[in-house]
């Protein structure tokens, strides 16, 4: 996934009004956390005098916020950097300067190697040092080539600017909020512990303050983010240890915040308090992304997942017992080293047993530096491709079945943005599906009562039937 993120205009006090403002173009690859990080870097640069452009050729600074989760991710970045190098040279011939920066997990993994392989790059900055971006960019403008890839994660959240009310309102009625970063699980296929570091949880007060700022800016729904978001822990009142369930309950007390979600979860960190939140919290949407990766105990052990297929299924049953309306999503990897036809059949059996509302599935890709890269019995590409085709066909069938079962249901719908057709808006169902409905643009941010009338391939259609809970 890529997303182009443009900064919003800076305020006049950000710089001399007689000097043309510098323009920045941010391209975001990968997960929701990168989208969140791009927004926060954008806020920091905006306060330093940068303004938006969604036209690459206009940019004085181009920043690629990268993802390293899949094979050849770094090579794709280098390919993009080659194109940017050519643009930089063309602008230099016209007497115009353009700096290039690389952020995100490729920056963390590659570090100085990026400067060696891509001499046009001026700045490399890892995920834990985004608060240093404005200063690093000032240094880069003097000709210094910058690499900032240490793990000062505590400083990052302390020093990044709080969400700006005007910018928040312009970004929409839903928002991401990172509460946890890093991973201590060390699954053998995954680079995250090496690019994002150890698990670190943000303090309660800091999270609540940011959530309140978002709500002040018109946000109605917040999704809490973390590499292992349900590993979040912090100190509550009187020093009591809090888990994610406690944090959700505290955020649920914020007036004006209508909905909460969280992602991504690890099965081992789904504790009783969090499961209970799915029963008792009306604001917590009945949707859970709970990756399992494989249905084979042998492969799960090789992946270092530290749970069995039976334990995963038992956990799903516990959660559905308290929230029968739950939509479950998952992640799957096919073709992990040593995976046999029988192992793959175990995965299909698990998928049948769970009946996912949606899921994400991928062929195993070797990640340099991970234990999985050293394993023997690598599965041939054609075998991986065939297994992925079979698995995705089953998952698509389940997703369509879930969507069709929604037809006729009445739900509360948060209207998020204009639809593709005139007079149409799009919102998200409680189960995260896009829902199209005829409504006025002035109703964006409202929660309306609708009846689902049709299930399309990738979205639902609805008619309005009830009163509006207006956005304040």
From Swiss-Prot:
Any one GO MF annotation of this record: metal ion binding
Main enzyme class: transferase
Q: Which reaction does it catalyse?
A: N(6)-dimethylallyladenosine(37) in tRNA + (sulfur carrier)-SH + AH2 + 2 S-adenosyl-L-methionine = 2-methylsulfanyl-N(6)-dimethylallyladenosine(37) in tRNA + (sulfur carrier)-H + 5'-deoxyadenosine + L-methionine + A + S-adenosyl-L-homocysteine + 2 H(+)
SUPFAM superfamilies, per the entry: Radical SAM enzymes (SSF102114)
Residues that hold [4Fe-4S] cluster 2 according to the record: 183, 187, 190
Task: Please name the CDD domains in this protein's record.
Answer: Radical_SAM
- Every MTTase N-terminal domain range: 22-142
Query: Which cofactor is essential here?
Result: [4Fe-4S] cluster
The record's subcellular locations are:
Cytoplasm
Keyword list (alphabetical) reads: 4Fe-4S, Cytoplasm, Iron, Iron-sulfur, Metal-binding, S-adenosyl-L-methionine, Transferase, tRNA processing
Amino acids binding [4Fe-4S] cluster 1:
31, 67, 105
Q: Is Metal-binding a UniProt keyword of this protein?
A: yes
Domain Radical SAM core: from-to ranges? 169-403
Task: List the PROSITE patterns.
Answer: MTTASE_N, MTTASE_RADICAL, RADICAL_SAM, TRAM
Q: How is the cofactor bound?
A: Binds 2 [4Fe-4S] clusters. One cluster is coordinated with 3 cysteines and an exchangeable S-adenosyl-L-methionine.
Q: Which residues form the TRAM domain?
A: 404-466
| Enzyme Commission number(s) of this protein | 2.8.4.3
Which GO CC terms are listed, alphabetically? cytosol
Q: List the InterPro entries hit by this protein, alphabetically.
A: Elp3/MiaA/NifB-like_rSAM, Methylthiotransferase, Methylthiotransferase_CS, Methylthiotransferase_N, Methylthiotransferase_N_sf, MiaB_methiolase, rSAM, rSAM_horseshoe
Q: What is its main location?
A: cytoplasm
> Is the keyword Iron-sulfur assigned to this protein?
yes
The protein's role, per its UniProt record: Catalyzes the methylthiolation of N6-(dimethylallyl)adenosine (i(6)A), leading to the formation of 2-methylthio-N6-(dimethylallyl)adenosine (ms(2)i(6)A) at position 37 in tRNAs that read codons beginning with uridine.
What the entry lists under NCBIfam families is as follows: miaB-methiolase (TIGR01574), MiaB/RimO family radical SAM methylthiotransferase (TIGR00089)
Quaternary context: Monomer.
What is the protein's given name? tRNA-2-methylthio-N(6)-dimethylallyladenosine synthase
Name of the coding gene? miaB
């Amino acid at each position: 996934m890529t997303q182009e993120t443009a900064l919003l205009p800076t305020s006049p006090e950000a710089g001399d009004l007689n000097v043309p403002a510098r323009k920045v173009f941010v391209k975001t690859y990968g997960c929701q956390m990168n989208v969140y990080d791009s927004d926060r870097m954008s806020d920091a640069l905006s306060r330093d005098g940068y303004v938006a452009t969604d036209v690459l050729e206009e940019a004085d600074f181009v920043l690629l916020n990268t993802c390293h989760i899949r094979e050849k991710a770094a090579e794709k970045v280098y390919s993009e950097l080659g194109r940017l190098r050519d643009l930089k040279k063309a602008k230099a011939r016209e007497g115009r300067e353009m700096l290039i920066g690389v952020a995100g997990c490729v920056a963390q993994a590659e570090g100085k190697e990026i400067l060696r392989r891509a001499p046009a790059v001026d700045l490399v900055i890892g995920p834990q040092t985004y608060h240093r971006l404005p200063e690093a960019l000032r240094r880069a403008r003097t000709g210094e080539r910058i690499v900032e890839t240490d793990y000062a994660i505590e400083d990052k959240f302390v020093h990044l600017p709080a969400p700006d009310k005007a910018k928040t309102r312009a970004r929409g009625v839903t928002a991401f909020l990172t509460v946890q970063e890093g991973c201590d699980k060390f699954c053998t296929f995954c680079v995250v512990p090496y690019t994002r570091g150890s698990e670190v949880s943000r303090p309660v007060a800091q999270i609540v303050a940011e959530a309140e700022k978002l709500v002040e800016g018109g946000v109605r729904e917040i999704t809490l983010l973390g590499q292992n978001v349900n590993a979040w822990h912090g100190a509550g009142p009187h020093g009591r240890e809090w888990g994610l369930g406690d944090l959700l309950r505290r955020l649920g007390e914020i007036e004006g915040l209508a909905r909460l979600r969280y992602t991504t979860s690890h099965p081992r960190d789904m504790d009783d308090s969090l499961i209970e939140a799915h029963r008792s919290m009306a604001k917590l949407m009945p949707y859970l992304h709970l990756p399992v990766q494989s249905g084979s105990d042998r492969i799960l052990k090789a992946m270092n997942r530290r749970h069995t297929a039976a334990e995963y299924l038992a956990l799903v049953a516990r959660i559905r017992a308290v929230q029968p309306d739950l939509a479950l999503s998952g992640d799957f990897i096919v073709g992990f080293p040593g995976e046999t036809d029988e192992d793959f059949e175990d995965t299909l059996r698990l998928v049948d047993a769970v009946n996912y509302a949606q899921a994400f599935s991928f062929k195993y890709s070797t990640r340099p530096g991970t234990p999985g890269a050293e394993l023997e019995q690598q599965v041939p590409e054609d075998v991986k491709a065939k297994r992925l085709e079979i698995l995705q066909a089953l998952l698509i069938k389940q997703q369509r079945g879930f969507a069709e079962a929604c037809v006729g249901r009445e739900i509360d719908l948060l209207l998020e943005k204009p639809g593709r057709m005139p007079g149409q808006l799009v919102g998200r169902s409680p189960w995260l599906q896009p829902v199209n409905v005829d409504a006025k643009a002035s109703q964006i941010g409202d929660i309306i009562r609708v009846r689902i009338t049709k299930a399309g391939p990738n979205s639902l259609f609805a008619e309005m039937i009830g009163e509006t809970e207006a956005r304040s």
